[in-house]
Amino acid sequence: MKEIQIPRKSFARSSELGAKRLKDPEMKNRKVTTEKRQIATFSDVSFESTKDPMDFSPISQISGAISDSEAESVIQGSSLDLMSTPEICLPADDSPVSTITSVEARIDTSSTDRIQSIVDLPASVQSLRGEINELKKLICSVDNSAEINWVDRVVTVKFRIVLLSFILWAILAAIVVFFSSGEERAYRGPLPT
């Protein structure tokens, strides 16, 4: 018996396809165009980044220089200094526009009340959560005990009815099978063909 050989199709390898793509002049033009766009974009970004020099020192060096107690004392001292200082300078630049001079540098009492309420917020939230949990327990204990008793009674009665129905059906089926199996009747009806 002679085997029939099916000619296999030769598939081009991926490297050959890449070479064909590069030989295509339209593809070359697209590649050159995209490279030009990328170079223009990245040169704009690099120009902007050199325009604004910034201090990029690691956070660990900055945070290591100031301890927690020093930071707290600076924060507390700065709030007192703000009330007594008539002149406030912004650190961005030393132009006359950035310097604010005012004799009436006051802190509104409502803002200090807001700050105090923000400080006391976690304690009040915890106390509210505790009260809510106690109320939930009280309400659930009253409602659940009455509701659970009612549900238990309904389920128990339903289970008893289903069980009684099943037992009666089993007894009736047993009686029918018991009495009908012993009799032999003569066949009455059309004869089989």
From Swiss-Prot:
The chain crosses the membrane at residues 161-181. It is a single-pass membrane protein. It is found in: Nucleus membrane. Keywords: Membrane, Nucleus, Transmembrane, Transmembrane helix. A motif (Required for nuclear localization) lies at residues 190-193. The keyword Membrane applies. Residues 18-35 have a biased composition (Basic and acidic residues). Residues 155-193 form the KASH domain. Coiled coil: none annotated. Residues 15-35 are annotated as: Disordered. One of its GO terms (cellular component) is nuclear membrane. The keyword Nucleotide-binding does not apply. Interacts with SUN1 and SUN2. The KASH domain, which contains a transmembrane domain, mediates the nuclear envelope targeting and is involved in the binding to the SUN proteins. This is Protein SINE3. The gene is SINE3.
